[in-house]
């Protein structure tokens, strides 16, 4: 098994995050700085036979897999930065160890999935899987029906052409949009390219998972049914 995949299974983060840790030379394998190509040895019971450390602390195989939903408020940073007082890391429970699946901009709010399941994170994050995310957006002024049609058809900005998506009006200055892309600040840049400024952006759903009555700033474990539906949707 490749090192990055094993680290993800241990709940360190997604495979992408595991690769960043390896590139930053923060992972050691049997006392030596680890490389991406390093294999991990497992016994017949799938127990690791190697000594792996992150910043000098031993990495053990993952605790029980956990799945939480968080209603992020504006001002909370999704990056796990101990030195940043606005980081979500200061809001997470001590156990189980959780990390965000993807990100919401610091100036956006709404649904954020937290887990220690690296395989699930990989399938939700990788663009080839194209899972839907639903947002409610309020602009700085009322917009036309043509704006909604343009958003749904795809918008070109900075040599980027966004894919067609679903969009519908909610009010004179608010709309709902369902994306399967995950470009950086995509909705804000699409709106800006059409002459509008986003005043409020809230993620309200990730596939079938919704916020429901969860208060802003609160988090809770997913129900067994929610976990089952989520796993079925990503085929794990």
Where are the language model's segments positioned?
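Basic, flexible Lys/Arg- and Gly-enriched helix-loop patches that mediate nucleic-acid binding at interfaces
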Residues: 1-236
């Amino acid at each position: 098994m490749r090192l990055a995949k094993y680290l993800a299974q241990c709940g360190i983060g997604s495979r992408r995050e595991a690769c960043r840790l390896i590139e930053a030379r923060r992972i050691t394998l049997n006392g030596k700085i680890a490389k991406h190509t390093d294999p991990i040895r497992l016994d017949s019971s799938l127990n690791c036979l190697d000594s792996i450390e992150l910043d000098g602390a031993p990495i053990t195989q993952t605790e029980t897999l956990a799945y939480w939903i968080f209603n992020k408020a504006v001002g909370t940073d999704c990056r796990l930065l101990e030195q940043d007082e606005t980081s979500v890391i200061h809001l997470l429970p001590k156990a189980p160890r959780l990390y965000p699946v993807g990100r919401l901009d610091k100036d956006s709010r709404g649904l954020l999935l937290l887990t220690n399941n690296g395989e699930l994170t990989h399938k939700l994050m990788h663009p080839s899987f194209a899972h839907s995310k639903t947002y409610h957006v309020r602009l700085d002024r009322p917009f036309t029906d043509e704006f909604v049609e343009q958003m749904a058809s795809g918008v070109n900005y900075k040599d980027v052409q966004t894919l067609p998506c679903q969009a519908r009006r909610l009010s004179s200055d608010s709309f709902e949009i369902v994306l399967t892309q995950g470009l950086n600040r995509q909705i804000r840049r699409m709106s800006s390219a059409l002459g509008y400024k986003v005043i409020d952006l809230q993620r309200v759903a990730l596939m079938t998972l919704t916020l429901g009555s969860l208060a802003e700033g609160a988090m809770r474990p997913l129900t067994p049914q929610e976990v089952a539906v989520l796993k079925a949707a990503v085929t794990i």
